[in-house]
């Protein structure tokens, strides 16, 4: 992320009669990466200031590779900006292509949102893999347990045993 910031910094200066450039970080990062680390790299390598000379935003990727029931267009897009003007520019960009854009108050909130989504998934996959081991020793079919638990219309989300987290 930071090396990319170094590489794109020289291109941030707006041309005459054009709007400020927009940089949107999409990678999974820890809270503070956009408004501290990336901003520092972009500013120090361009001589420009985020929010004043260029827009800076964060919007986490939310895809589930291999699933065909959700498209990039239909998955709500969490967006944030370094300043309110940066947020507006990010909302304008994604609203042109995404059905639902969900603005949050800061880049840190958006970064923490992505981490929370990933942690939720990781914890539940780890849990169901452990349950599979325990239930097998007890002679219980974990797949049947998950299907039965899935009949509860609230408070349960099925996760299935597998080789790990996957991703890309």
Give each language-model segment a name.
Residues 1-168:
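Structural/interface elements that position substrates and couple domains in central-metabolism enzymes
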């Amino acid at each position: 992320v930071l090396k990319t910031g170094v590489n794109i910094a020289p291109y941030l200066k707006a041309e005459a009669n054009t709007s400020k450039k927009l940089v949107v970080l999409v990678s999974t990062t820890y809270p503070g990466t956009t408004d501290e680390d990336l901003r520092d790299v972009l500013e120090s390598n361009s001589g420009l200031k985020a929010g004043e000379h260029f827009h800076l935003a964060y919007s986490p990727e939310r895809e589930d590779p291999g699933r065909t029931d959700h498209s990039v267009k239909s998955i709500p897009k969490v967006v944030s900006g370094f300043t309110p003007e940066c947020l507006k520019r990010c909302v304008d960009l994604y609203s042109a292509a995404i059905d639902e854009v969900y603005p949050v108050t800061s880049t840190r909130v958006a970064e923490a949102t992505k981490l929370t989504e990933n942690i939720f998934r990781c914890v539940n996959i780890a849990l169901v893999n452990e349950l599979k081991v325990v239930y097998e020793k007890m002679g219980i079919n974990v797949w049947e347990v998950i299907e039965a638990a899935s009949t509860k219309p609230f408070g349960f989300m099925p996760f299935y045993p597998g080789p790990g987290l996957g991703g890309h």
